[in-house]
Every structure is written in C-alpha cells, then in structure tokens.
Amino acid sequence: MINIRPDEISNIIRQQIESYDQEVQIDNVGTVLQIGDGIARVYGLEQVMAGELLEFDDSTVGIALNLENDNVGAVLMGPGLGILEGSAVRSTGKIAQVPVGDAFLGRVVNSLAKPIDGKGDIPASETRLVESMAPGIITRKSVCEPVQTGITAIDSMIPIGRGQRELIIGDRQTGKTSVAIDTIINQKTEDVICVYVAIGQKASSVAGVVSTLEDKGALGYTIIVAANADEPATLQYIAPYTGAALAEYFMYKGKATVIVYDDLTKQASAYRQMSLLLRRPPGREAYPGDVFYLHSRLLERAAKLSDALGGGSMTALPIIETQAGDVSAYIPTNVISITDGQIFLSGDLFNSGIRPAINVGISVSRVGSAAQTKAMKQVAGKLKLELAQFAELEAFSQFASDLDAATQAELARGVRLREMLKQKQNSPISVEEQVAIIYAGINGYLDTIPVSEVKGFVEKLRSYLRNSAPQFISSIQSEKKLSPENEELLKKILTDLKG
C-alpha cells in the first residue's frame, strides 16, 4: 500500500496556488472586412494607435493608417496572399522599429532592415524607431565642415557641407545617380558612413550600384536599403525612413554620415497610391494633402549636431526626377523649398557631351559656402564669374558675326573652362588636385592649349602633382589654403608642364 503524506501534497498544492499568475493578457483583436491592392479594412480594433503595427493570421505585418468611425484602414508590408475576409487581426501595441548597428555596414537590406544579399543574418546592437523625431534647434549646429563630392564643378561652385540637404534634380538618364555614387566613392578617405536608399528601382540597377561600390572599395562603409519596383507600395514608402534610422544610429555616435534617397519621386508615387486606395481626398496632381509633410519630416532628420551631442552629422542628398525639365511641378517645388539648395542636371547639356551635366546657372547651395575650404574659395569665386560671363557671351555671340579680340579671348577661355570641368563617371578628384586644375584654368594656363587637349593636360597635371610634387598636396591638406609659396610652386609646375 502506498504511503500518502498529506503534508507533502498540501505543500505541492500551496506552491501551485502561490505560483498561479492572475494576470490576464488582453489582446486587441479585429476582423478583416475587405482585402485587396495591399489595403485591408479591419473591424473591431477599438484601441489601435495611428501608425501601430498589426499582425494578420498569415504573419503578414500591416500599419494602421486610417482610423475611421467603424473601421481601420491598414496597409500591408507584404503580399498578404493568405489573408481572407473574416481573418483575425491582432494589434501589437508597437510602432514600426528597425534593428540598427555597426554590422549593417557593407550589407544590402530591405525596407524592414532584413538582409537580402544572401550573406546571412545581421547581428543588431539596438533598435530605432522608423519615424523618429528630428533634432531640435538647440541640439543643432550650423553647417561648418565640407562634404567633398570629388566632382570639381560641385565642390567649387555648389559646395555641400556636413548636415546640409542638397537636392539632385533632373530628367531621367541625366546622371543623377552617378553624382550620388561618385560622392559615396569619394568618402573613402574621409571616415564618413554612407547610406544609399533605392526606392522603386529595377533590381538590376541596384545590383549595378552594389557592384560599382564593391569594385571601388566603397561598400565597406556603405549600407544599401533597397525597395525594388516589384515590392508593395508600403515598403517603397517606408524605405527612406528606414535608411534615415540607420544613418541616425551613426550620427548620434558622433560620426559623419551621408544618405542618398534615390528617388523621392517614386516614394511620393507609392504614398499617393496608398492614400488613394485608402480613399483619402486627393489634392494637386492627385497627391494627398500631407505629401509635403511626407518629405519634410524625412529631410528635417538631416542635421549637424551640437558638440554636446558628439558633433555627428547626417547630410541628405535626395534625388527628384523631373518630366521634360519641369521644376515647377508639385513634388519638385515641394522638395526644393525643403532643401538647402539644388544641383540641376540638364538633359540638353548631357546630350551635348558635357558630363556631369550640371547647369551651374540655376544650381545653388544656400549654406555650403560656409563649409568650403579657404583654398577652394580662393579659386572658385573667379571660376563662377568667368563661367557666368561666358554663358552670357555665348548666347550673344550666336547673333553677332564680328566679335572683338577681347570677347573672342573670353569665349575661348570659357570653352576651355567648360572642358576642364568635364569628368569621367566613378573617378572623383581630390580637393587639392581640383584647386590646382581650377587655378590653371582661371589664370590663362589653358588658353593656348587646343580644346581637344585640355583633358589630357588636366590628367598630366594630376599625375605630376601625385608623383613629383606631393609636397603641394600635403601642404594644402594641412594648411587648407593656397599660400604664396604654394602658388609659386604651382606656377612653376604649370609653366614646366606647358613647356
């Protein structure tokens, strides 16, 4: 017969009573009323927040965007093929967050910061809100350090500073992405973290960018966020904010970062698609009323932080595609008004062989001149003036048959300056070499060289400076100005090369 010990049984019962958890878990559950086109109408989610993540039966995640009297309009962040009318939906109580960390460098991720490059999982050190607040007035500092793009025309006449928002705008196939990629490649020696966000692009284009960065040794300090053209509109809409969250992680660690949004026209189109399907009232060009806020809250996250916060920075290079050069359309005017200047790329210049096809006349940098190095300022002022005069004379000379010698000389110099500013794709030039090249152009050293040989002379000068006069480059790097001694040395080099 088994010996039953009542005290042991009572102890076990007592322990079970004590360990019994009386806490009730309350789930906010709703039902799918309607599903289609990446939009779900959900009934019964009474306690849901705007922007809250929702979980559907098939594990698809959605975002609650429209909170209406009798239902909630949610956008899906996936195909949602397993969602049916009547399926259950659970609110998560969370706002969209993405993992961030140093391990993301050199990787290609999707809009939710999940790896898509086949190199395995990415260990994340923390998470950040996709839609986080932009730095306030007190936490910012004015732009004071340069971001060198390696493109002579930009670094001299449209300078960009750390923490600036500089728009790259132009028609399709005018070299907008090339300008951004050259800027990323040029950060190799600058200790700058780069984030490239591809929105609504062909997967082949993104693969091309990845291989270019890899070939140039720039992928190691770059993160690529890709929301390809075949992905749901929600993921194309959210991709820039994910890129900004990844860049902010480094910015708040005191690092300088550059983020490229390629391009915001496609993000606005994705947002328009979502808004119209959610039956929000359309405005100008059928965009919703808050499309300005869509871009302003994104671009305001770019900043140069105060020294108290580590002095980090996020420089934003948004790209906008225009139709037939029309910068007065809705989205271009919005983004021009938000940013601190724009680089305008012209299809006519591109087709006439001037590459990068920068229209210097209507391109501007509103705050970058404060960050420009003294050496560049010494030569850039005259370059801008001479090119402006040349543009005016060139237009005038088309109607005049006989021109005096001074005008002809000015036109000849202008043609050579324009030739001097042409540059190959993916081959950025250091700022020290740029100073020497511009000095040669504005001081007449190219005037007697045939136009077809200007490029060759520029290459010869760069090669000579690197191999035979490294003291000139190191002196400008340390002093940041063109001293009288350096000027004499440069004059001697230019005279020798011409002779």
UniProtKB/Swiss-Prot annotation:
<keyword id="KW-0934">Plastid</keyword>
<keyword id="KW-0066">ATP synthesis</keyword>
<dbReference type="Pfam" id="PF02874">
    <property type="entry name" value="ATP-synt_ab_N"/>
</dbReference>
<dbReference type="InterPro" id="IPR000793">
    <property type="entry name" value="ATP_synth_asu_C"/>
</dbReference>
<keyword id="KW-0375">Hydrogen ion transport</keyword>
<feature type="binding site">
    <location>
        <begin position="170"/>
        <end position="177"/>
    </location>
    <ligand>
        <name>ATP</name>
    </ligand>
</feature>
<feature type="site" description="Required for activity">
    <location>
        <position position="363"/>
    </location>
</feature>
<keyword id="KW-0067">ATP-binding</keyword>
<comment type="subunit">
    <text>F-type ATPases have 2 components, CF(1) - the catalytic core - and CF(0) - the membrane proton channel. CF(1) has five subunits: alpha(3), beta(3), gamma(1), delta(1), epsilon(1). CF(0) has four main subunits: a, b, b' and c.</text>
</comment>
<dbReference type="Pfam" id="PF00006">
    <property type="entry name" value="ATP-synt_ab"/>
</dbReference>
<dbReference type="InterPro" id="IPR033732">
    <property type="entry name" value="ATP_synth_F1_a_nt-bd_dom"/>
</dbReference>
<dbReference type="InterPro" id="IPR027417">
    <property type="entry name" value="P-loop_NTPase"/>
</dbReference>
<dbReference type="InterPro" id="IPR004100">
    <property type="entry name" value="ATPase_F1/V1/A1_a/bsu_N"/>
</dbReference>
<keyword id="KW-1278">Translocase</keyword>
<keyword id="KW-0406">Ion transport</keyword>
<keyword id="KW-0139">CF(1)</keyword>
<dbReference type="InterPro" id="IPR020003">
    <property type="entry name" value="ATPase_a/bsu_AS"/>
</dbReference>
<dbReference type="GO" id="GO:0046933">
    <property type="term" value="F:proton-transporting ATP synthase activity, rotational mechanism"/>
</dbReference>
<comment type="function">
    <text>Produces ATP from ADP in the presence of a proton gradient across the membrane. The alpha chain is a regulatory subunit.</text>
</comment>
<keyword id="KW-0472">Membrane</keyword>
<keyword id="KW-0547">Nucleotide-binding</keyword>
<dbReference type="InterPro" id="IPR038376">
    <property type="entry name" value="ATP_synth_asu_C_sf"/>
</dbReference>
<protein>
    <recommendedName>
        <fullName>ATP synthase subunit alpha, chloroplastic</fullName>
        <ecNumber>7.1.2.2</ecNumber>
    </recommendedName>
</protein>
<dbReference type="Pfam" id="PF00306">
    <property type="entry name" value="ATP-synt_ab_C"/>
</dbReference>
<dbReference type="GO" id="GO:0009535">
    <property type="term" value="C:chloroplast thylakoid membrane"/>
</dbReference>
<dbReference type="InterPro" id="IPR023366">
    <property type="entry name" value="ATP_synth_asu-like_sf"/>
</dbReference>
<keyword id="KW-0150">Chloroplast</keyword>
<comment type="similarity">
    <text>Belongs to the ATPase alpha/beta chains family.</text>
</comment>
<keyword id="KW-0813">Transport</keyword>
<dbReference type="InterPro" id="IPR005294">
    <property type="entry name" value="ATP_synth_F1_asu"/>
</dbReference>
<dbReference type="GO" id="GO:0043531">
    <property type="term" value="F:ADP binding"/>
</dbReference>
<dbReference type="InterPro" id="IPR036121">
    <property type="entry name" value="ATPase_F1/V1/A1_a/bsu_N_sf"/>
</dbReference>
<keyword id="KW-0793">Thylakoid</keyword>
<dbReference type="GO" id="GO:0045259">
    <property type="term" value="C:proton-transporting ATP synthase complex"/>
</dbReference>
<dbReference type="InterPro" id="IPR000194">
    <property type="entry name" value="ATPase_F1/V1/A1_a/bsu_nucl-bd"/>
</dbReference>
<dbReference type="GO" id="GO:0005524">
    <property type="term" value="F:ATP binding"/>
</dbReference>
